[in-house]
Amino acid sequence: MKIVAFTLVAFVALAGASCPYAAPAAAYPAPVAPSGYPAPPCPTNYLFSCQPNLAPAPCAQEAPAYGSAGAYTEQVPHYVGNPSREQVQQFHQRIGMAALMEELRGLGQGIQGQQY
């Protein structure tokens, strides 16, 4: 087996040494000009156009000085704190009952599917 591998390696080395190295040809020619799509003309009959209108609206009020609340008109959300021990026990009971009901439902379907 070693002789076969050695012969194969020697043949590949001999074949590689006898062939002059040539750089691979390019797969495709480089594009002459960058490809792309031209920009569409600016619309003139739409509510919003390409040109920005930076003048303020005549009925606009002055911007208020933003404090710590920023521009929000809603109340800052309050997150629920840690649940009490009773709430945790109720949660665990509900999860346990749901798991038990799912198990019983699966057993009921298994019994109905059996052939007697």
From Swiss-Prot:
Subcellular locations according to the entry: Secreted
Keyword check for Metal-binding: no
GO MF annotations in UniProt: structural constituent of vitelline membrane
Primary subcellular site in the record, as a coarse category: secreted
Any single GO CC term annotated in Swiss-Prot or TrEMBL for this entry: extracellular space
Gene Ontology BP annotations: vitelline membrane formation involved in chorion-containing eggshell formation
UniProt superkingdom: Eukaryota
Entry keywords, A to Z: Secreted, Signal
VM domain segment(s): 36-73
InterPro entries xref list: Vitelline_membr_Cys-rich-dom
Signal peptide: 1-17
The protein's role, per its UniProt record: Major early eggshell protein.
Family: Belongs to the vitelline membrane family.
The protein's name: Vitelline membrane protein Vm32E
Organism: Drosophila santomea
